[in-house]
Design a protein with these regions (language model features):
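Thiamine diphosphate
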Residues: 1-169, 173, 178, 306, ...
Length: 323
């Protein structure tokens, strides 16, 4: 076991699966599947497996999604890496085909397709047209499509393994802001379930739920609140669809207070669904959500950081909810 970054952990898992599955393919544009890590060998999928299996398509997200979907329908395990989530050209394929064909064929069509979409938004100074990309709930609205967003290198490796081995299509959201995050990750393959949330800290005063890019700020806030004497139960959704309702309900039944934190937009953010599900199952609980405002991100880095939820925002909301 060694300290590994988010993307190194993912490519290490993909490399192993491609060695086991001789027809598995990886499709990409712009960003070659190469990763290095201190004390570990460089991973270069294109060099190891050749261009027949690791294909640089050029800048054409629709073609990438279509080729991935077609390969999966032909029985080939396929993964594509789309480096800008805001490029929504593949959306109609995900909406009208990827999520439905397995059901439309009575379950006969296997769909081992994984779509890695990089969440490149919420970056100070990129301005509205290049930062408007924390649109995670777009994909969780699509029936038949699983949507996951790991927040740690350990979960990223385990969940990409589960996604590749799943016969259903999976959207695998990659929070680009976490690219430099590293932690101990096993060298061997392992699976992290695609339908289970993770309880990061246990507590009895307040439940805080986040996912993907919001989790570092959630954990900072949870630690600060602990120093103030507040016992926080911090939950990482990991999966946006299916949502682990049981873990959420069990926590809020104990704390009776729920705060959700999202880097995506306030209206219809993942936290809205979390609150709705808990409210249907827990009586007498109090709720609050914080998220990025429903406004285009400004070009000013200072204003952008002021708008984006951070640990201070989480702490203030938690104090108000508990107090």
């Amino acid at each position: 076991m060694a300290q590994k970054t988010w993307m190194y952990s993912v490519l290490e898992a993909v490399q192993y699966e491609m060695r086991q599955r001789k027809d598995m393919v990886w499709l990409f544009e712009l960003t070659p599947p190469v990763a290095s890590n201190p004390g570990k060998p460089v991973i270069n999928l294109e060099k190891e497996f050749g261009r027949t299996r690791v294909n640089n398509t050029g800048i054409d997200e629709l073609w990438m999604a279509a080729a991935t979907l077609g390969s999966a329908l032909a029985g080939v395990t396929a993964v594509t890496y789309i480096p800008y989530q805001g490029n929504c050209m593949p959306f109609q394929l995900l909406q009208n085909h990827a999520g439905k064909l397995r059901s439309m064929t009575g379950g006969k069509a296997s769909m081992p397709a994984t779509f890695i979409l990089e969440m490149t938004g919420q970056t100070p100074g990129f301005a509205g047209q290049h930062s408007d990309y924390e649109i995670d709930t777009y994909y969780s609205h699509i029936p038949g499509l699983k949507t996951v967003v790991p927040s740690t290198p350990y979960d990223a490796k385990g969940m990409i393994v589960s996604a590749i081995r799943d016969p259903n299509p999976v959207v695998f959201l990659y929070p680009a802001g976490l690219r430099d995050l590293s932690e101990d990750v096993p060298d061997e393959q392992y699976e992290v379930p695609l339908d289970k949330a993770a309880v990061r800290t246990e507590g009895s005063d307040l439940t805080i739920v986040g996912s993907g890019p919001s989790m570092p700020e959630v954990m900072k806030a949870a630690e600060a609140l602990k120093q103030q004497g507040m016992n926080v139960e911090a939950i990482d959704l990991r999966s946006l669809k299916p949502i682990d309702t049981e873990t959420l309900v069990n926590s809020v039944q104990k704390t009776k207070r729920l705060l959700t934190v999202d880097q995506s937009y306030y209206t219809l953010c993942p936290g809205a669904e979390v609150i709705a599900r808990v409210a249907e199952n827990v009586d007498g609980a109090r709720f609050k959500r914080i998220a990025f405002p429903d406004a285009p991100p400004p070009a000013s880095p200072e204003m952008f950081l002021w708008m984006r939820p951070n640990a201070d925002h989480v702490i203030a909301a938690a104090q108000k909810l508990v107090g």
